[in-house]
Design a protein with these regions (language model features):
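Mid-length scaffold segments of soluble, non-membrane domains
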Residues: 81, 90, 94-120
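Transmembrane beta-strand segments that form the barrel wall of outer-membrane beta-barrel proteins
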Residues: 86-97, 118-129, 147-157
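Transmembrane beta-barrel domains of outer membrane proteins
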Residues: 75-79, 112-114, 139-141, 169-171
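Sec/Tat signal peptide C-region and signal peptidase I cleavage site
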Residues: 15-19
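Residues that define the transmembrane beta-barrel architecture of outer-membrane proteins
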Residues: 64-70, 103-107, 128-134, 147, ...
């Protein structure tokens, strides 16, 4: 009797061990994504609709319908080894109108996608003295070794009017 109980006990322990050797039907997650810092200076021009110029004038800010832009883009690109589409997250801080002795701050938070060939599209909120709006941007990044030169066009429609920008700059591709 003792031997039978001992055998049943050992058999009971062996069943869970056997269950552990079976391959479970679990999806293995992909390897972690890598991020690349693509931060760098940005500069360009912005065309302001008359409504935006008037809105700024109401706030005692007098500028013409075309202003220069200078600033910095803080960008992180998330990619995988497959070389497919990459996701990006960026904050763009610009000062506009410096050539007119005015400093118009602008802050945009953009999220978007970039193709392996460098074509990109992003969307996100934009805040300026003219108000809050949703920015839409698209462009292409030209690459030469580690040097990247983005050419970006942005459209920012708002209640006050529309802003259209063309920005460029550069950054050095560096893994973080």
């Amino acid at each position: 009797m003792r031997a039978a109980v001992l055998m049943l006990f050992c058999a009971g322990l062996a069943v869970p061990v056997g269950a552990q050797t079976q391959t479970p039907d679990i999806t293995i997650p992909p390897p972690p994504l890598k991020t690349v810092s693509l931060s760098g200076p940005r500069f360009g021009v912005t065309a302001l609709s008359q409504g935006v110029v008037d809105k700024l004038h109401e706030r005692s800010i007098d500028v013409s319908s075309t202003i220069t832009q200078f600033g910095w883009q803080f960008e992180r690109e998330f990619y995988n080894k497959g070389g497919g589409v990459a996701a990006m997250n960026e904050f763009v801080f610009l000062l506009g109108g410096l050539e007119q002795s005015v400093a118009l701050p602008s802050l945009s938070w953009m999220v978007g996608l970039r193709s392996p060939s460098g074509a990109e599209f992003g969307i996100g909120p934009n805040v300026t003295p003219a108000g809050v709006a949703l920015a839409l941007a698209g462009g292409v990044t030209f690459r030469s070794g580690s040097l990247n030169v983005p050419m970006t066009f942005a459209l920012v429609p708002s209640k006050a009017g529309t802003r259209i920008s063309m920005l460029t700059g550069f950054n050095l591709r560096g893994r973080r």
